[in-house]
C-alpha cells in the first residue's frame, strides 16, 4: 500500500521539477522569453546558446539540483523504491511538463542526471563520459544527450544495479530519446546546432 507520505513527496517533487529556472533566468538576465529563442526549449543548452556560457551553466546546475534535492528528500522521508523512483519520475515530469508554463518544459537531461546522481552515481558518471566524448568529438550536445541516456541502462546492467533502478533507467532513456525527436530529425538533415556554431 502506498503511504500518504509517498504521495505527498511525489507531488512535491513534481512541483520542484516545475520550477522553470531557464525561463526565469532568461527573463531576469536579459528580459527575454527563452521559449521564443533558439530551439524554444527552456533547458540549459538553449540558454547557453542564446545567452552564453555563464547563464547556461547556472541553469544546468540549478536543473540538476532539482533532481538531486528531490531524490535525497525522498530517501530521508520514505526510503523505499516506490517512493524514491516515484519522486525521480515526478521531478523529471515536472521539468518536462511544468505547471507554471502550461506544461511545456525541458528535455529532462539535467534534472534526470541530478536524480540519477542521487540514486546511483557510478552509472551516471559513465553515462556522462559517453556524453562528454560524443560532444567533444561531434560538437552536438543533443547527440551526446541521446547516447548518454541510451548508455545508462547498459551501465546499470553491467554494474548489477537494483532491478528497479534498471527498469527506471530504461524508462528514462526511452523518454529522453522521445523528447529529442526533433533534434534527431535535425541531426539527420544536418541542420542541428553545433557547439561553436555562430547563431543565425
UniProtKB/Swiss-Prot annotation:
GO terms for molecular function: acyl-phosphate glycerol-3-phosphate acyltransferase activity. One of its GO terms (cellular component) is plasma membrane. One of its GO terms (biological process) is phospholipid biosynthetic process. It catalyses: an acyl phosphate + sn-glycerol 3-phosphate = a 1-acyl-sn-glycero-3-phosphate + phosphate. It is found in: Cell membrane. The keyword Transmembrane helix applies. Keywords: Cell membrane, Lipid biosynthesis, Lipid metabolism, Membrane, Phospholipid biosynthesis, Phospholipid metabolism, Transferase, Transmembrane, Transmembrane helix. Its EC number is 2.3.1.275. It holds the Pfam family G3P_acyltransf. InterPro entries: G3P_acylTferase_PlsY. The keyword Transmembrane helix applies. Its main location: membrane. It is an enzyme of class 2 (transferase). It is a multi-pass membrane protein. It comes from the Bacteria. The chain crosses the membrane at residues 9-29, 54-74, 81-101, 112-132, 140-160, 165-185. Pathway: Lipid metabolism; phospholipid metabolism. Belongs to the PlsY family. Catalyzes the transfer of an acyl group from acyl-phosphate (acyl-PO(4)) to glycerol-3-phosphate (G3P) to form lysophosphatidic acid (LPA). This enzyme utilizes acyl-phosphate as fatty acyl donor, but not acyl-CoA or acyl-ACP. Probably interacts with PlsX. This is Glycerol-3-phosphate acyltransferase. It comes from Desulforamulus reducens (strain ATCC BAA-1160 / DSM 100696 / MI-1) (Desulfotomaculum reducens). The gene is plsY.
Amino acid at each position: 500500500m502506498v503511504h500518504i507520505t509517498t504521495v505527498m513527496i511525489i507531488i512535491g517533487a513534481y512541483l520542484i521539477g516545475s520550477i522553470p529556472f531557464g525561463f526565469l533566468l532568461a527573463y531576469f538576465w536579459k528580459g527575454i522569453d527563452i521559449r521564443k529563442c533558439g530551439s524554444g526549449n527552456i533547458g540549459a543548452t538553449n540558454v547557453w546558446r542564446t545567452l552564453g556560457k555563464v547563464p547556461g551553466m547556472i541553469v544546468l546546475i540549478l536543473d540538476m539540483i532539482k533532481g538531486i534535492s528531490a531524490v535525497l528528500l525522498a530517501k530521508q522521508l520514505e526510503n523505499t523504491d516506490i517512493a524514491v523512483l516515484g519522486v525521480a519520475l515526478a521531478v523529471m515530469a515536472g521539468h518536462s511538463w511544468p505547471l507554471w508554463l502550461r506544461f511545456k518544459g525541458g528535455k529532462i537531461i539535467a534534472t534526470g542526471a541530478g536524480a540519477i546522481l542521487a540514486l546511483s552515481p557510478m552509472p551516471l558518471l559513465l553515462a556522462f563520459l559517453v556524453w562528454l566524448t560524443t560532444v567533444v568529438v561531434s560538437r552536438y550536445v543533443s547527440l551526446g544527450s541521446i547516447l548518454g541516456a541510451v548508455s545508462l541502462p547498459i551501465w546499470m546492467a553491467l554494474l548489477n544495479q537494483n532491478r528497479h533502478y534498471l527498469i527506471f533507467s530504461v524508462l528514462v532513456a526511452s523518454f529522453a530519446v522521445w523528447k529529442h525527436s526533433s533534434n534527431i530529425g535535425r541531426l539527420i538533415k544536418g541542420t542541428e546546432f553545433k557547439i561553436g556554431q555562430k547563431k543565425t
